[in-house]
Design a protein with these regions (language model features):
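N-terminal membrane topogenic signal
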Residues: 17-29
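Membrane-embedded alpha-helical segments of integral membrane proteins
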Residues: 34-98
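Active-site recognition of the HExxH zinc-binding catalytic motif
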Residues: 73, 250-271, 275-276
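Transmembrane alpha-helices and immediately adjacent membrane-cytoplasm interface residues
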Residues: 88-94, 107-141
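Membrane-interface segments at or immediately adjacent to transmembrane helices
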Residues: 132-202
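Post-HExxH zinc-binding segment in Zn-dependent metallohydrolases
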Residues: 154-156, 265-310
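Auxiliary, metal-adjacent structural segments of Zn-dependent hydrolase domains
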Residues: 175-243, 247
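Pan-zinc metallopeptidase signature
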Residues: 319-384
Length: 384
């Protein structure tokens, strides 16, 4: 006997209710997290709303979290990640045993999948709120008022030479080991990090923030395997850095992660503000490291634009600078593995999900900003 569409609808509702009753709290959490993510995807087209959220709500939260966690002598972010990994492994182990040894495997498997989905979506929803909004509000160029005009090869060459000369000047103002490589005191670099942005804040109030120190990661070698020199953790508002990477790179990495801590989300802009703050700070370790970072970005662009000009500038590099650049390249070549490739693929996918590319205009945002900002200084230096 045909029950009719109304009876079929009632049956479906009872079925859905029965499924929901298997783990109601987890279903609610899953739906709430999915709702937050959906709202974020819809709202991110509203630039004004994203600006108000990022500047008026999230940055104050970051300041409070950063100041709170500054009292902890280790990376709270690393501790949370380690606990999460251990907790996940333990949870999966227990659930695997229960699936094998206890009845109602189908229901248990369903609850497990809902639990994992709810956990993943909740973390991602919080990430959208605590960091994703920065990608759709005002970027550093908009907040600072800096121009990012198209640049010529002549300008690129001049600024590349300027930073090469700066690296040459500071190469012998940093500590070096018996083999001639930079061996700056890593702990001292971290100790000085709260003051790195002090001078830059005066010119760019949009970068103002509490003077917080970057934190070294205990499992830094793991970061090297996944090609990370540092990361900003929005859940604790900490700037975390890889302490195993070459000493010549550390100070610039610290400044880069501190840029994220001060609301600069885009990677290319964070590279620029890292160089800017380090040079304004004036400390030899920071100036040298930032000069290497700037030269690397500019040199890569110049290599493609005018190879002869690049060769001329490279030939003028101090032996100590060349040694540090080559040592850094050798270090990272050791980690050229499928794990690193997979990590880079995931990270590139993450950037693309937030409509971010590695560059703007012809050479990339970092290069364009460096050339536009430092071209006048480069000309003045060349005429001295």
């Amino acid at each position: 006997m045909y029950s009719g569409p109304m009876e079929t609808t009632k049956t479906k509702k009872r079925g859905l209710a029965a499924i929901f009753a298997l783990c109601p709290a987890r279903h609610v959490l899953l739906l709430c997290a999915a709702g937050v993510i959906a709202l974020h995807l819809l709202a991110r087209a509203d630039h004004a709303l994203m600006r108000r959220l990022s500047e008026g709500a999230v940055r104050p939260i970051h300041r409070a979290l950063g100041q709170l966690n500054a009292h902890v002598p280790f990376s709270v972010a690393e501790a949370l990640i380690a606990l999460a990994v251990l907790g996940l492994l333990g949870f999966l182990g227990v659930q695997a045993v229960r699936l094998v040894t206890r009845p109602e495997r189908g229901r248990r498997l369903y609850r497990l999948l809902v639990t994992l989905a709810a956990a993943v979506l909740t973390v991602y929803a919080l990430f959208c709120l605590l960091w994703g909004v920065f990608y759709y509000g005002d970027d550093f160029m908009a907040r600072s008022g800096l121009k990012n005009d198209p640049i010529s090869t002549e300008q690129l060459t001049a600024v590349t030479r300027y930073f090469a000369d700066l690296a040459n000047t500071y190469a012998h103002r940093v500590a070096r080991d018996d083999s001639g490589l930079c061996c700056s005191d890593r702990a001292e670099i971290l100790r000085k990090s709260p003051e790195v942005f002090a001078a830059t804040e005066e010119e760019f109030p949009c970068l103002a923030g509490p003077p917080l120190a970057a934190k070294g990661i205990f499992f830094s070698r793991v970061m090297s395997y996944v090609d990370f020199t540092g990361f900003f953790f929005p859940f604790t508002a900490e700037a975390n850095v890889n302490m195993d990477s070459p000493a010549c790179d550390l100070a610039a990495t610290v400044a880069h992660e501190l840029s994220h801590q001060r609301g600069v989300a885009k990677e290319q802009e964070a590279n620029f503000t890292a160089v800017l703050a380090s040079l304004r700070y004036g400390d030899s370790d920071y100036v040298y490291s930032a000069s290497l970072m700037a030269y690397t970005h500019l040199g890569n662009a110049l290599y493609r634009a005018d190879h002869e000009a690049w060769e001329e500038i490279f030939a003028g590099l101090d032996e100590a600078v060349v040694a540090d650049l080559r040592a850094s390249a050798r270090y990272w070549a050791r980690f050229d593995t499928p794990v690193r490739t997979a990590s880079n693929t995931v990270y590139e996918g993450f950037l693309q999900s937030y409509d971010q590319t590695l560059g703007l205009k012809s050479y990339g945002a970092c290069v364009d900003l460096l050339v536009n900002y430092y071209y006048g200084q480069a000309l003045a230096s060349a005429n001295d």
